[in-house]
């Protein structure tokens, strides 16, 4: 049996093809191919008579296998993310976007690939607020974001839909910012996703906090997503589709806010493409941050 140790550490764990496969798929390699590479790595270690191997040796061997198979960009990303995780730098990812655009799905996939255990939906924060704040005190949090305008009191000069949405966002943002502050303070990794992640309301604290705005490519795409969602959710598609105009008005507002605060806007058409864009953006920005500290995360092993 091959056992794996961290350099300078006495604790060893059995070599796992599953764990190595997951780390390879995190850079966009198909799971079947990733598993075959993991097997090749294991077979080569056995051939060399290795019973104890360091994580660095596994990384180097995996990197070489990716290069041999022509996956130069994937190899570069692999070595970057392995080194990044080894540094234990806290990473916070914020995902905003309109109702139904697929924020939760993207957040879950990112968490899996990056090994982040904490994924927080802003709807959960809103639900907590609903339990402790009565409708009489703050009525706009006790309804959907696209219907919050109906709870507004007084005259609204601009868009009532946006005004109602902002009212709910202002309340939920208090909880979002508190979570971000704690994560930064305690050095925790986290992904926060939800419609309430709005540029200018949510504080982007810490150099390793990244925000992205996910949007639907078209009205038809968003409508199709609502019907698709009924396959695994109790939420009826017709309810959301009947309010599609309001949802799209909020999307337009979110796009304007994202552009104003230089937040990347990503059309969420296909999961792999969206996840790859986010991970590539984080990688490039992190490389620049680390270069400023004299660290090269892309140096060949």
Swiss-Prot record:
UniProt xrefs under InterPro entries: 2PKG, ATP-cone_dom, P-loop_NTPase
EC category name: transferase
Catalytic activity: (2R)-2-phosphoglycerate + ATP = (2R)-2,3-bisphosphoglycerate + ADP + H(+)
UniProt entry tagged with the keyword Cytoplasm: no
A Pfam family: ATP-cone
EC number annotated for this UniProt entry: 2.7.2.16
Entry keywords, A to Z: ATP-binding, Kinase, Nucleotide-binding, Transferase
Domain of life assignment: Archaea
Any one Gene Ontology molecular-function term assigned to this protein's record: kinase activity
Cofactor(s) this protein cannot do without: a divalent metal cation
Domain ATP-cone positions: 2-89
Pathway: Thermoadapter biosynthesis; cyclic 2,3-diphosphoglycerate biosynthesis; cyclic 2,3-diphosphoglycerate from 2-phospho-D-glycerate: step 1/2
Family: Belongs to the 2-phosphoglycerate kinase family.
Described purpose of this protein according to its UniProt entry: Catalyzes the phosphorylation of 2-phosphoglycerate to 2,3-diphosphoglycerate. Involved in the biosynthesis of cyclic 2,3-bisphosphoglycerate, a thermoprotectant.
Official protein name in the record: 2-phosphoglycerate kinase
């Amino acid at each position: 049996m091959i056992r794996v140790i961290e350099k300078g550490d006495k604790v060893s764990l059995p070599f796992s093809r599953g764990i190595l496969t997951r780390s390879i798929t995190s850079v966009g390699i198909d799971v079947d191919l990733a598993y075959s590479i993991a097997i090749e790595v294991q077979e080569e270690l056995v051939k060399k008579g290795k019973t104890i191997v360091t994580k660095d040796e596994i990384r180097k061997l995996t990197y070489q296998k990716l290069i041999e198979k022509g996956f130069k960009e994937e190899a570069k990303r692999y070595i970057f993310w392995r080194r990044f995780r080894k540094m234990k730098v806290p990473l916070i990812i914020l995902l905003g976007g309109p109702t139904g655009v697929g924020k939760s799905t993207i957040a879950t996939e990112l968490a899996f690939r990056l090994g982040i255990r904490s994924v927080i939906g802003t709807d959960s924060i809103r639900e907590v607020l609903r339990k402790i704040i009565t409708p009489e005190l703050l009525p706009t949090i006790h309804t959907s974001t696209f219907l919050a305008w109906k709870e507004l009191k007084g005259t609204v000069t601009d868009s009532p839909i946006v005004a109602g949405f902002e009212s709910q966002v202002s309340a939920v943002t208090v909880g979002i910012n508190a979570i971000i502050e704690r994560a930064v303070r305690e050095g925790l990794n986290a992904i926060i996703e939800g419609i309430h992640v709005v540029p200018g309301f949510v504080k982007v604290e810490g150099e390793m906090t990244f925000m992205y705005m996910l949007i639907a490519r078209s009205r038809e795409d968003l409508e199709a997503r609502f019907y698709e969602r009924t396959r695994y959710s109790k939420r009826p598609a017709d309810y959301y589709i009947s309010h599609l105009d309001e949802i799209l008005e909020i999307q337009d507002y979110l796009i304007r806010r994202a552009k104003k605060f230089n937040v990347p806007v990503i059309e969420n058409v296909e999961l792999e493409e969206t996840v790859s864009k986010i991970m590539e953006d984080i990688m490039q920005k992190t490389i620049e941050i680390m270069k400023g500290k004299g660290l090269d995360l892309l140096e060949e092993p």
